[in-house]
């Protein structure tokens, strides 16, 4: 068995385990009355407020907005795969947890389909060691686990970017905290902040 075949086989096994684990999470945690009491109707974020603050990713979808760049833009072959975009109803901590667990399953389904449809031939593209980008500017968006990432790049024709600005998901998502914490109980602080799943490296711009 070649390395590629073994990698595909092991990846399929791993994805099946992810799907199985997500199902266990739903049964053991999602149905737990204590967990539901601590997360339902806690840290509610409406769709209107989420969109006004530029929130994206699972947090936006948990508020009932079916927004995903993989289906809205024309990058990578996502249109060739069969998968769902999980959305919430109440925009609370429970929905944000629930959407993420369901997205684990959908991501695993995409990986399994990608392996089954992988064309034959070399896996690595032949690219030059040094890429000289033409003079100009561009902005590219991509869907990431925590939300939308944006890259604004200016090239002066040299070997590196003249200017690079990165818009991170966490930077926008964490900006909603003052709204979500208004009137909240102190014990709810950890649940609300945890449900945003932000990374400080993303927030520090």
Feature names for model-found ranges:
Residues 4-205:
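Active-site bordering "gate/hinge" segments
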């Amino acid at each position: 068995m070649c390395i590629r075949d073994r990698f595909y086989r092991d990846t399929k096994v791993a994805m099946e385990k992810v799907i199985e684990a997500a199902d266990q999470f739903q049964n053991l945690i999602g149905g737990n009355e204590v967990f539901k009491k601590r997360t339902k109707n806690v840290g509610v974020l409406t769709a209107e407020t989420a969109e006004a603050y530029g929130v994206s990713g699972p947090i936006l979808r948990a508020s009932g907005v079916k927004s995903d760049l993989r289906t809205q833009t024309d990058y990578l072959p996502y249109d060739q795969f069969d998968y769902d975009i999980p959305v919430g109803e109440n925009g609370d901590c429970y929905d944000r947890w629930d959407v993420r667990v369901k997205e684990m399953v959908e991501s695993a389904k995409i990986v399994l389909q990608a392996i089954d449809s992988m064309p034959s031939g070399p896996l690595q593209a032949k690219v030059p060691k040094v890429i000289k980008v033409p003079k100009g500017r561009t902005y590219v968006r991509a869907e990431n686990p925590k939300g939308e990432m944006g890259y604004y790049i200016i090239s002066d024709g040299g070997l590196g970017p003249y200017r690079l600005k990165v818009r991170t998901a966490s930077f926008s998502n964490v900006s909603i905290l003052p709204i979500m914490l208004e009137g909240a109980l102190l014990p709810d602080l950890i649940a609300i902040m945890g449900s945003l799943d932000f990374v400080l490296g993303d927030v520090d711009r």
